[in-house]
């Protein structure tokens, strides 16, 4: 593709909770907004208030009191394509303000994404948005690129799903990828539940967003959970205040670390799954014995749900306990890990060697949506 040289590719990382979009070569996404589509709950009664039938992203968030909010991506996989199309449309035209038919677009997908999903993404890009070229990359692999490594194991935990993805010399090892349907949204729900025990009622979709904010601002991971619980019983040093939008102030104590503890003890939310530390270990154990040392020494955290302070120390402690005693364990938590998938995409799409990897519109017209399995791996 000769004409791709002068035009900046678009990188769009569609997460369950947030869309991160921008231009290849930039060091951060230009647009970050919630992956949410809101539809009015009531009929408009004011004449001349040109009400829309759907709102996307921040606008949906700000009007959340009168809307029903829907998330088209569940557990990292697109479940509602009409809403997803609205989100992409909003991304291109309102956030980035570009014509999608003029820019190649790099999309991201969850590991172990169903084949039909990839094809549908490809089809929408070429047929609805008329993209000149596109590519679909696996999220965790991009995070590893962003950390400057080609070998390591990525624990990518977002709003809807967590994955452990071992990567050796740039190739993900699909047989060893593990998926854990436990992520940020479950933590928010759990925090809603344990705040109820304190007498604070949060129930609606709009109130869930408030709890998400409490979680992001006040939660942390305890290095030693039992000890932290004991301390919190006797002292109030851990208590913090949070002001709700209506001015009411609530106090939150042990909930601060009980919430992210779910990542290490999924039984708290009734899940019979291994925690993120054990899942990471199990993933490493599914790999060839010769590469395990390289994986143990390069455990890379990525995604918004790894932003809790204390999480890297706790991971390190837990994995050291599971691994052989002589093994050197290194957990890397890059400061920009909230956006490392996007940053990796930005790096990848601007590499000169990547330019022959794009699927062009001509190739798509010739081969159909199935081309995505041949060209993107």
From Swiss-Prot:
It is an enzyme of class 3 (hydrolase). It is found in: Cytoplasm, Cytoskeleton. It catalyses: ATP + H2O = ADP + phosphate + H(+). SMART domains: ACTIN. It comes from the Eukaryota. One of its GO terms (molecular function) is copper ion binding. Its EC number is 3.6.4.-. Belongs to the actin family. Polymerization of globular actin (G-actin) leads to a structural filament (F-actin) in the form of a two-stranded helix. The binding of profilin to monomeric G-actin cause the sequestration of actin into profilactin complexes, and prevents the polymerization. This is Actin-8. The lineage of its organism: Eukaryota, Viridiplantae, Streptophyta, Embryophyta, Tracheophyta.
């Amino acid at each position: 593709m000769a004409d791709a040289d002068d035009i900046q590719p678009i990188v769009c990382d569609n997460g369950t909770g947030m869309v991160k979009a921008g231009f290849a070569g930039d060091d951060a996404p230009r647009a970050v907004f919630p992956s949410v589509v809101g539809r009015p709950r009531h009929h408009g009664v004011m004449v001349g208030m040109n009400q829309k039938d759907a709102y996307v992203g921040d606008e949906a968030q700000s009007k959340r009191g009168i809307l029903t909010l829907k998330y088209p991506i569940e557990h990292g996989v697109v479940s509602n394509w009409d809403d997803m199309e609205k989100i992409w449309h909003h991304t291109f035209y309102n956030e980035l303000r570009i014509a999608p038919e003029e820019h190649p677009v790099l999309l991201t997908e969850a590991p172990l994404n169903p084949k039909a999903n990839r094809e549908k993404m490809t089809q929408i890009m070429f047929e609805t948005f008329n993209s000149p070229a596109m590519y679909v990359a696996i999220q965790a692999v991009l995070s590893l690129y962003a950390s400057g490594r080609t070998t390591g194991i990525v624990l990518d935990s977002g709003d809807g799903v967590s994955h452990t993805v071992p990567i050796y010399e740039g190739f993900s090892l699909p047989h060893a990828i593990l998926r854990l349907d436990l992520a940020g949204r479950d933590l928010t729900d759990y925090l809603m539940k344990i705040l109820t025990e304190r007498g604070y009622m949060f129930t609606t979709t709009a109130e869930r967003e408030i709890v998400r904010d409490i979680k992001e601002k006040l939660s942390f991971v305890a290095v030693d959970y039992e000890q932290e619980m004991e301390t919190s019983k006797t002292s109030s040093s851990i208590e913090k205040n949070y002001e709700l939008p209506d001015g009411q102030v609530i106090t939150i104590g042990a909930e601060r670390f009980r919430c992210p503890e779910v990542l290490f003890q999924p039984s708290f939310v009734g899940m019979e799954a291994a925690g993120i530390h054990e899942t990471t270990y199990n993933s490493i154990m599914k790999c060839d014995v010769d590469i395990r040392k390289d994986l143990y020494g390069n455990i890379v955290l990525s995604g918004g749900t790894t932003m809790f302070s204390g999480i890297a120390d706790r991971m390190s402690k837990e994995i050291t306990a599971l691994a052989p005693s002589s093994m050197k364990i290194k957990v890397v938590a890059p400061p920009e890990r909230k956006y490392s998938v996007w940053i990796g995409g930005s790096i990848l799409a601007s590499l000169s060697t990547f330019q022959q990897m794009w699927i062009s519109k001509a190739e798509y017209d010739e081969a159909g949506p199935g081309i995505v399995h041949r060209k993107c791996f």
